[in-house]
Amino acid sequence: MIIFNIDVMLARRKMSVTELSNRVGITMANISILKNGKAKAVRVETLDKICRALDCQPGDILEYREDEVE
């Protein structure tokens, strides 16, 4: 599974979710969906805007973790 580590970059940049939402042009609810791992997909355009707003690379906010076996 792919994990979005947006909180880490927000803390490093001292930026609020509200500010990120305004800069990227997506709702706070959609940012929350990304942060909580509930997103089924993300547009490359949205990822680009998030990276621009946070001044980071995609690898700084995306992490791959193997699914846990139940």
Annotated model-derived regions:
Residues 23, 41, 52-53:
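Residue cluster at the C-terminal edge of the helix-turn-helix DNA-binding motif
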Residues 8, 33, 40, 62-70:
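Short, charged recognition helix plus adjacent turn
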Residues 15-33:
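Short alpha-helical DNA-recognition segment
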Residues 7, 18, 48:
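Residues within the helices of the helix-turn-helix
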Residues 46-51, 61-62:
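Hydrophobic micro-packing sites on short alpha-helices
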Residues 10, 21, 51:
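The alpha-helix within a helix-turn-helix
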Residues 1-15:
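A short, Lys/Arg-rich alpha-helix, primarily the initiator
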